[in-house]
A protein has these predicted regions:
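N-terminal secretory signal peptides that target proteins for export/translocation
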Residues: 1-3, 37
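Buried hydrophobic packing residues in well-ordered domains
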Residues: 106, 136, 243, 279, ...
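C-terminal hydrophobic structural anchor segments
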Residues: 714-746
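Flexible glycine-/small-residue-rich
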Residues: 237-239, 249, 347, 414-416, ...
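C-terminal outer-membrane beta-barrel translocator/porin domains of Gram-negative envelope proteins
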Residues: 456, 475-480, 607-720, 727
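Gram-negative/organellar outer-membrane beta-barrel architecture
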Residues: 437-438, 456-608, 613-616, 684-693, ...
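Classical Sec-dependent N-terminal signal peptides that target proteins to the secretory pathway
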Residues: 3-23
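Patatin-like phospholipase
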Residues: 23-133, 141-444, 448-460, 471
């Protein structure tokens, strides 16, 4: 049941579970010193498992015939003692043994490795070699470059581990043009060959994970040979192309570890040359043989992964069967790796889940406990003299850590569709000494542009290498909305990015299916290296229902069909500030209006200018940021003569960690002798029509006027990252004159609860307008525009 719960958790909430298994055959080195002499020249290379498969096969066969693995940890260590007696003639004196430590993968459970390091350090055990897979590679890597166990513990306690699995860009950092296209996306799937949707290669590209790892190892990323660290290190990853385990000892340590923890379906694979890396736990979750290749005589292994468990067939489902069957060989490989160990430790982590990163102290304590349970064996390995030599070596290496690197050139790798010239706008004009934040800024600017699944940097001598993985050019999108006014709405469409020379093209095509159907197509062309000048085009067709109109002795609904074709020039003054000027042609056809004089079709050209500034962290119930837009439209033609102005602004002010205070004002007005229905101001309900203002407690569109002003104050209490409660007071002034502030007044009081989900926002509340009945509010999904 625990495996089932973990699988469901990560499928629906995009969290991480490390399967921690392998499917490659292991090798027992019965006489490691003799055998390793044959491959000593390979110890500083990236070594595939096939490179060591043929080493002393006769020893392997003899061993497997004579020995079998029992599951109890105690028996494993007893057999290790027996093995040492049998090979006594080849035994190296205890004080001269070179000790290696292998740390397995296991996501949050891998934090138990820190507790074991603390005990080994206290007892002055001179660990000269460390290997790791997945989470184990992070801990092993930190230990190898010179972090002390105490420092690693402090980092683990203060680090936001779940951030590794979230590549989400803050909305304000995307920029206004991306937000115009992407704001209401719920489900986005890339299009493959023949325009067929396909699943992405991973839930996250791994950009944040790479950035966090570069931060941890920044001082040492200039050293590209891991055997030159104070403790020789190797990370283990799986080559997806060949299915082989790969021992990585060269390159960027941050990239090597990122490859080792690339959980299939969670992280996108990492490409390095001809190899495509995924999590090393798929083939070798406990990298013991890699210690022997590095040169270890005595091996300690710490396993925090799962093993074989007895299944109840009545409680199994399809996911359980698929998961278990695909990892059988992997679990067998872990057991084969255990046979190579001299000391095996498996902390008791049954009460912890793979995603329990909030229980850092408890998990570390579990690791410390298993080490103290084996304290007698650990003390036999104590060698204060050699330990002090290693400690001095560690301190000397730490002195070489640097805050800056002298960069003389910048290369882009991984780009195919986007040529090198495309990246010039993101790169500094002058090179020289660069620190981590400056390198991260370059990567962030490239990634925030939205054309790459991941981006990360490496330092190779004096060269800064920016690695990118390009996104597909086209996507299919899907979202929907359910509310108590327009009922159900489904939106589907296409989005994408294209490059035409120096022109970056973003496009969007959406279709709305409901009682109020419509089609919207938008294109944004970025001109020049900095894309400060934009050509914008928009085609819009929609069928709006205008509700609750008073005529004669009752209320009725009618239809306004709008068609608009518009183009213009935009100037991106800053990342979140856009000035637009343009014009187009529009039709407005009114049907079923009880006032027969207003039925009919108007055709007219129009001109429009707008200014928009937007730094909100969300378009629905933001907790911080500013939003302002002002749009002026006019027409002077046979069918239409009007001037219209729409303005709105809000400031979302955080008050402490939980509260957000939001004052907001909106003004909508029109004046002219012949005003199309599209530009007639309306007030009430949830805003879904053109030229309407939201006002809870009133039926949709019930109040009309030539000028409407609404002011409101909202207090939002954020219960968690996804849940909140809010209360709002609003006041409206209505006038029958254009560009006026009227004397007719309406007030609204609202209280409700909201939720933010991957599929869109949800809200339920109640609202009261004096003189109206108490009304409820129900909305799920982005509101149709």
């Amino acid at each position: 049941m625990k495996r089932k719960n973990m699988i469901y958790f990560f499928i629906f909430f995009i969290f991480l579970i490390n399967l921690s298994f392998s499917d490659e055959k292991g090798i027992f080195l019965e006489n490691p010193k003799e055998n390793l002499e044959k491959i000593s020249d390979e110890s500083e290379k990236n070594i595939d498992i096939k490179d060591v498969k043929n080493i002393r096969k006769d020893n392997l066969e003899k061993f497997e015939k004579k020995n079998f693995l029992k599951k109890e940890d105690k028996n494993i260590n007893e057999r290790s003692e027996s093995k040492k007696s049998e090979n006594k003639k080849n035994e190296i004196p205890q004080k001269d043994k070179k000790i290696g430590l292998a740390l397995s993968g296991g996501t949050a459970k891998g934090l138990a490795h820190i507790g074991i390091l603390k005990v080994l350090d206290e007892e002055k055990v001179p660990v000269e070699f460390v290997t790791g897979t997945s989470m184990g590679s992070i801990i092993a890597g930190m230990y190898s470059v010179g972090y002390t166990p105490k420092e690693i513990e402090e980092i683990a306690e203060n680090m936001d581990w779940m951030k590794l699995f979230n590549d989400k860009i803050e909305r304000r950092n995307k920029g206004i043009t991306r937000n115009m296209i992407e704001d209401q996306n719920s489900i986005v799937l890339p299009l493959g060959k023949k325009a067929m949707p396909k699943l992405p290669v991973g839930v996250v590209g791994g950009k944040t994970a790479s950035q966090q790892l570069n931060e941890l190892f920044y001082g040492a990323i200039g050293t590209d040979d891991f055997t030159k660290f104070p403790r020789k290190f190797a990370a283990v990853a799986t080559d997806l192309n060949s299915g082989e385990g790969v021992m990585i000892t060269k390159g960027s340590i941050a990239t090597a570890i990122r490859a080792s923890l690339s959980l299939p379906s969670i992280f996108a694979p990492v490409r390095s040359g001809d190899r495509l890396y995924i999590d090393g736990g798929v083939v070798r979750n406990l990298p013991v043989q890699d210690l022997k290749v590095l040169g270890a005589d005595y091996t300690i292994g710490v396993n925090v992964g799962d093993g074989f468990v007895k299944r109840d067939e009545n409680k199994m489902n399809l996911i359980d069967v698929i998961t278990d069957s695909s990892t059988i060989a992997g679990r067998q490989e872990v057991e084969r790796q255990i046979r190579m160990l001299d000391l095996y430790m498996k902390p008791d982590l049954e009460k912890f889940e793979a995603y329990d990163f909030s229980k850092v102290k408890e998990i570390i304590a579990a690791g410390e406990k298993i080490a103290r349970d084996n304290i007698d064996k650990i003390r036999e390995l104590s060698n204060p003299k050699l330990y002090d030599e290693l400690e001095e070596k560690r301190k000397e290496f730490r002195k070489t850590w640097t805050d800056e690197y002298n960069i003389t050139s910048i290369d882009i790798e991984g780009n195919k569709k986007y040529k090198d010239s495309y990246f010039k706008k993101f790169l500094p004009k002058k090179l020289g000494n660069m620190n981590r934040l400056e390198m991260e800024e370059i990567v962030n600017e490239i990634y925030q542009n939205g054309n790459f699944t991941t981006a990360y940097y490496e330092v190779k001598n004096n060269k800064l290498v920016i690695n990118v993985q390009e996104k597909p050019s086209d996507y299919v999108t899907l979202n929907g909305n359910i509310n108590n006014e327009d009922k159900a709405t489904i939106n589907f469409g296409f989005q994408g990015n294209k490059v035409l020379g120096d022109i970056n093209v973003r496009y969007s095509s959406n279709t709305t299916v409901s009682n109020e159907y419509g089609i919207n197509n938008s294109v944004i062309l970025g001109i020049g290296k900095d894309e400060k000048v934009l050509i914008l085009g928009n085609l819009d067709y929609k069928r709006d229902m205008i509700y609750n109109q008073n005529f004669g002795n009752g209320y009725y609904d009618f239809v306004n069909k709008k068609f608009s074709l518009e183009t213009g020039v935009g100037f991106q003054i800053s990342k979140n500030l856009l000035l637009f000027a343009g014009g187009g042609y529009q039709t407005s056809k009114v049907e079923k209006n009880q006032d027969q004089r207003k039925n009919g079709k108007k055709r007219f050209p129009f001109f429009e200018t707008s200014l928009t500034y937007d730094t909100r962290n969300s378009i629905e119930s933001p907790t911080k940021g500013i939003y302002f837009t002002s749009k002026y439209t006019f027409s002077n033609s046979k069918d239409a003569n009007f001037n219209a102005l729409y303005q709105t602004g809000e400031v979302n002010i955080p008050v402490g960690e939980k509260l957000t205070f939001t004052p907001k004002v909106s003004y909508l007005t029109v004046k002219g002798s012949d005003i199309p229905e599209t530009y007639e101001p309306k007030l009430g309900g949830i805003k879904t029509e053109d030229n309407s203002l939201e006002f809870f407690g009133l039926p949709a569109d019930k109040v009309r006027g030539e000028s409407i002003f609404v002011g409101s104050v909202k207090l939002q209490y954020n219960i968690s990252k996804i849940l909140y409660a809010d209360t709002m007071y609003s006041r409206a002034y209505i006038s029958d004159e254009g560009f006026d502030f009227g004397s007719r007044k309406r007030e609204s009081y609202k209280l409700g609860f909201g939720v933010k989900t991957p599929l869109g926002p949800g809200y339920f509340g109640i609202a009261k307008v004096p003189g109206e009945t108490l009304r409820y509010i129900l909305n799920f999904g982005y509101k149709p525009q």
